[in-house]
Regions:
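N-terminal cationic and glycine-rich segments that engage phosphates or anionic surfaces
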Residues: 1-125, 129-141, 238-241
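Positively charged, low-complexity, intrinsically disordered RNA-binding extensions
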Residues: 139-242
C-alpha cells in the first residue's frame, strides 16, 4: 500500500476526537443504547453491541462507562428513541461523501446535513448514488510504535482468525475483514494483547479523488467541519485524498 498513511489519518482523527471527547462519548453512548434495545445486553449474542464496544475501546472510553451505558439501556424503558439514517452525496469535483446519523428527529437531521452540503457547494444525491464507490470492511489499524510483535506472526494471527487481508505501511499494519468476521479477528488480536489504534466496521473508498484547487479544498473542509459539529452525525466517509 502506498499514498495513504492509515495511521497518519487515525492520528489526525484522534486529535480531533480528543478535542471533543465528550461528544464522542455521547455518540457512542447513543449507539450502545440502540444496540442493547435491538439485541440485548450480552455482546457475545449481540453483534452490533460487540461492534460498538470495540469502537468505544478504540476511542479510549473507560470500561466502567461502557458497562454503565449497557446497564442503563437494559433497564430503561423510557429513554429517547433514536433512529439510524444515512445520507449520500457529492462534494467538490465529484468527491463522494456518506454520512451516517443517529437521531431522534430525522427532519432536523436532514435539514442540517443538507445545509452542510449546500454551504460547501456540494449536493445530496439519491440514496444509492455513491455506495458503489466504497466497500464495507472491518478495519483494524495497529501502530508499529505500539506493537512489539513480528509482522509475520501478527499476520498469521489475523489471517487464522478470518482476516481477508493484511497490509504493512511505514508506520502501521492494516487488517481488513468482512463485516461478519470483524469481531472474531478483533477478539483474536485482543487476546494476544495487541494494541489497536482503530478497530471498526467502516466504508473504504475504492479510489481516491485529489483536489488541487484551493476553493475545492476550502469547500470540502467546510462540509466535513459542519458535519463533524453536528451531534446527530455518527460517522462521515469520503474519498478525498487528504
Amino acid at each position: 500500500m502506498s499514498g495513504h498513511s492509515k495511521f497518519a489519518n487515525i492520528k489526525h482523527k484522534k486529535e480531533k476526537n480528543d478535542a471533543a471527547k465528550g461528544k464522542i462519548f455521547t455518540i457512542i453512548g447513543r449507539e450502545i443504547a440502540v444496540a442493547v434495545k435491538e439485541g440485548g445486553p450480552d455482546p457475545s449474542n449481540n453483534f452490533k453491541l460487540a461492534q460498538v464496544i470495540a469502537k468505544a475501546k478504540s476511542n479510549n472510553m473507560p470500561n466502567d462507562t461502557i458497562e454503565r451505558g449497557i446497564k442503563k439501556a437494559a433497564g430503561d424503558g423510557n429513554s429517547v428513541n433514536y433512529e439510524f439514517c444515512t445520507y449520500k452525496g457529492y462534494g467538490p469535483s465529484g468527491t463522494a461523501i456518506i454520512v451516517k446519523c443517529l437521531t431522534d428527529n430525522k427532519n432536523r437531521t436532514a435539514a442540517n446535513v443538507r445545509n452542510a452540503f449546500t454551504k460547501g457547494h456540494g449536493s445530496i444525491g439519491t440514496q444509492g448514488c455513491v455506495s458503489y464507490m466504497f466497500d464495507e470492511k472491518g478495519q483494524i489499524i495497529i501502530a508499529k510504535e505500539d506493537c512489539e510483535m513480528d509482522a509475520d506472526d501478527l499476520m498469521m494471527i489475523a489471517l487464522d482468525a478470518g482476516a481477508e487481508d493484511f497490509n504493512e505501511e511505514e508506520d502501521c499494519f492494516e487488517v481488513l475483514t468482512s463485516p461478519d468476521d470483524f469481531e472474531a479477528v478483533r477478539s483474536a488480536l485482543e487476546a494476544e494483547n495487541i494494541p489497536m489504534a482503530e478497530a471498526e466496521v467502516t466504508m473504504i473508498p475504492q479510489n481516491y479523488v485529489e483536489l488541487s484547487a484551493d476553493e475545492d479544498i476550502t469547500n470540502i473542509n467546510r462540509i466535513l467541519d459542519l458535519l463533524d459539529d453536528d451531534d446527530d452525525v455518527q460517522q462521515v466517509y469520503h474519498n478525498w485524498d487528504e
